[in-house]
Amino acid sequence: MRLKFLHLHLHGLIRSKNLELGRDADTGGQTQYVLELVKSLANTSEVDQVDLVTRLINDPKVDKEYSQKEEFVEPGVRILRFKFGPNQYLRKELLWPYLDHFTESLISYYKKNKKPNFIHAHYADAGYVGVKLSKYLKVPLIFTGHSLGREKKRKLIDTGLTTNQIEKLYSIRKRIEAEEKTLKSADIVVTSTNQESVIQYSQYSSFSPHKAKVIPPGVDHKKFHHFHSTTETAEIDNMMKPFLKDSTKPPLLTISRAVRRKNIPSLIEAYGRSEKLKRKTNLILILGCRESTSKLDPQQKDVFHNIFETIDKYNLYGKVAYPKKHLPSQIPALYRWAASRGGVFVNPALTEPFGLTLLEASSCGLPIISTNDGGPKEIRSKCENGLLVDVTNIDELKVILEKGISNNNQWKIWSRNGIEGVNRHFSWNTHVRNYLSVLSEEFSSSNSYSSSDIKQSCLKGTSSLIKPH
């Protein structure tokens, strides 16, 4: 019998195409990760159906697609949306009071429909629901934290925020409690790097190291490649023209959400302190899409205020670009455009569980300069595609940025290494092959679950994993 998966991804905005990455603090790399994972799983011979369950949102401020109860993604994959809480779109910190009602709705649904063989919960909120649902349905629970509350709290305290401020902004206590309960109940904890399991998850008393399985995510190599066209180059040039005096200079490109953790003001500060960088490069900030900063949530407003203040402090007009809008299809083009001009991709985040944008950039031939926190260490060790830096030290960040654009021969080595390294180590086919192998190893000989179809499906192995096209 072929397997059925249920993936829980409750916050942010997710749909089958045209993801609004960077629109807000809740719609970022995790959203893309989950969508790519469910599509890749469905494209295997072992898997019959993958359901991605998320929140139904009926809010005029967001697209109508998010109010569809069911959305077809591709054969074997669908998005199911359940209403919980008010109609309007809410940030994840405000969803906690409604999760019990959502759990009851899911239980009612599966009383009438075929239950999954596995539940995979993404982030603490989904973990909270996944624990209760897996116990009721008596099926295994897989958990991916994506980012963890204890690690986030530690880094925010380092920036000067108090525990009370952090609690008010992020409901961090509820999140950590949910993570502890999920780690206790989960059968498998999927991490992207060894650093996650050894350092980040080990901060939790409920974490059992033997449950952790390191399965790095992949890159869509059809989108993220190093063959650029004159058409897309001209398109990106036009995007930058309103901002830059000379768009031919090597760009320092960053792509992220406008949230505190991403540490964008520090990047601008380092750039502003360097006469060399201001003379020789441009700084490109792709921070999601916005109509007006006045319509953003409080955290984003604060981040943009700091960004504009720092740009003004160093009079960086004509050297820094911060477009209000971009299309999802333009992200790969931005990487290739930056590479064609001898630029680098910069990730200045305070914490980085993995760093999917680093893989995307490298796959497009763009070297990286990244935070030395978390996943980037392992990406660089496998790819040798750039430099790492302590981003809390502004002067060190300045020096490393200068070094990144100083040696053309070294730049070419990093660029080539990145392309080859990502192709070798990071693909979604490899990810799902490892993912299903882990399930086979964990459950084919386990007596923890009596459901024979799980064991039989896993015993098949993954020898002919990918469906023929």
Indicate where each model-derived feature is located:
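Catalytic cores of nucleotide-sugar-dependent glycosyltransferases that transfer UDP/GDP/TDP-activated
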Residues: 1-469
